[in-house]
Amino acid sequence: GISYWLEMDTVTGRIGGKVLLAFNLSFCNFIFARLLDNKTANEVAKHLYAIKNNLHQKEMSFCELFPVILTDNGGEFARVDDIEMDVRGESKLFFCDPNRSDQKGRIEKNHTLIRDILPKGSSFDNLTQEDINLVCSHVNSVKRAAFNGKSAYELFTFTYGEELATLLGISKIDPENVIQSPRLLDK
């Protein structure tokens, strides 16, 4: 059986602006995200293709790493074939029941950690992918009691290695340097 899955969701900035396509690996709450120009199925498909291609160039397979994807019924996830298919096989896409975001509760919890840094209603339009990688790196580096004082980054890299984390744009932040507030992105 499947012991873990990849949760996928969007986090919106200002209405009509850029959004985050967020991914959360269920067993360790490791999160990575891509900055989308808009909340459309085409943008989701384009960024998923880029992630898959990036992994493929390093002889890694998206569908082997993430065989099961769980998301909601948002219109941005309508291109099922583009989400599931990969040159090396396919992932299986499952949708939560309507109005049951609790069925992907792990990513919802990480959304609250992202919102500590990017408050609800704030615009993502001036952010870069590097900013989003930094936000996710800080979220992944928070030590968690549920993981016996380990961080999501530590669990993920123990399982998959640092190369994959780096490919996904995530780096380790030392615990004393983790910032969980909007000042993380003060420039």
Q: In which residue ranges do the predicted regions lie?
A:
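Mobile-element integrase/transposase regions
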Residues: 1-20
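Active-site beta-loop-alpha junctions of metal-dependent nucleic acid enzymes
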Residues: 16, 33-59
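Short, surface-exposed basic-aromatic patches at helix termini and helix-loop junctions that form
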Residues: 26, 81-92
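Short small-residue beta-strand/loop micro-motif enriched in glycine and branched aliphatics
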Residues: 29-34, 95, 120
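C-terminal domain-tail junction helix/linker
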Residues: 120-187
